[in-house]
């Protein structure tokens, strides 16, 4: 009897201990489950981000950016509305996440070991690295040992900890944390020659190069690391489970690939000379013709129409080619007659006819193609003819791809010039590799116009002068005085 009593007491004590140990976990789970439930009850997902040319920005048609489109898709998956909250920097972003002001932090955020101890990670969806950048034309450093000036870096990442790790090897390495400037703004300061170096996310570097080609990469400071969304708490919860399912679907269904294609896949095509000439043309020539592009845009974005015109003629209304195409939009004589214009070298007539012809091509694209991709199929037809575009779709289907998926069709365009394929095509040989490059260039040119005006607007809205070196952003925190 005594033994039984002791066993009962011991069992009861074990139950109490187990409850004591499990209760905090239960509370934590309940708290995080309530976050998921709260999102459903309020009917709104709140996502924090940082303004930059890839993640999030306000365009002519409202909110845009990779993180915005992915967040919007996740909100749709949850069946709720989306609210985006833009922060000044990464530090504010993680403070807001810790204070439960936002449900998710999404801003092209690399994996950060220290943050992973405090917050929960969503699935990786692409990768990037930290790069040291300098102004093209200046002496290029080959390693951190050659950095004599203090590096100026933005707040809100684990970059200070990464640099601390290099101090054993490079004891003279120093840096300053910028309190008032974003990573993008520091990159622009490098381009302007106001600061010598900064270290930035490789995706953001490539994006800013599209409007400031003077920015050059010296070397990678780190290997590539995965990019994640960050969620509150570091334990499993319903919100993370929902995000995992959504991300898997987005990856397998091609949503993430399509968004990446839209915002940064064209970055690999960067050419310093071409981009420098283009940015100069945006500044000097585009203002003259922008009202015409806007007037005749129809259902298109005027900046897309402008990008097409630059690809065609470099905004030269008197342009001609040996093949007989002429004018701002480089129209053939037959197209000009079909669109009923008399003078192909008249900028207004050319832009109007080019836009009308492109709208007609879009109407000829099969209805099965998603709305956001129809323009790229139409531009392929604009460049090499509608029949060859349809051949590219048939070939893609024959090769096991999806003829309605632009990413699948795009990669097969060069095959239209290969002898093993074109004899079996309805419309025969075509320089598909040129059509491929044509569309890639237009996407790059369009994004450059968008970001050029966005950067200009941000600069105009800055409540500070920016013309002299005396106006370097202050205050700065020396890494020897305060480490993050």
UniProtKB/Swiss-Prot annotation:
Role: Murein-degrading enzyme that degrades murein glycan strands and insoluble, high-molecular weight murein sacculi, with the concomitant formation of a 1,6-anhydromuramoyl product. Lytic transglycosylases (LTs) play an integral role in the metabolism of the peptidoglycan (PG) sacculus. Their lytic action creates space within the PG sacculus to allow for its expansion as well as for the insertion of various structures such as secretion systems and flagella.
**Active-site residues annotated for this sequence:** 312
For this entry, the protein name equals Membrane-bound lytic murein transglycosylase F
Domain description? The N-terminal domain does not have lytic activity and probably modulates enzymatic activity. The C-terminal domain is the catalytic active domain.
**GO cellular component, as recorded:** cell outer membrane
| UniProt organism field | Mannheimia succiniciproducens (strain KCTC 0769BP / MBEL55E)
> In the UniProt record, does the keyword Transmembrane occur?
no
The domain of life for this entry's organism is Bacteria
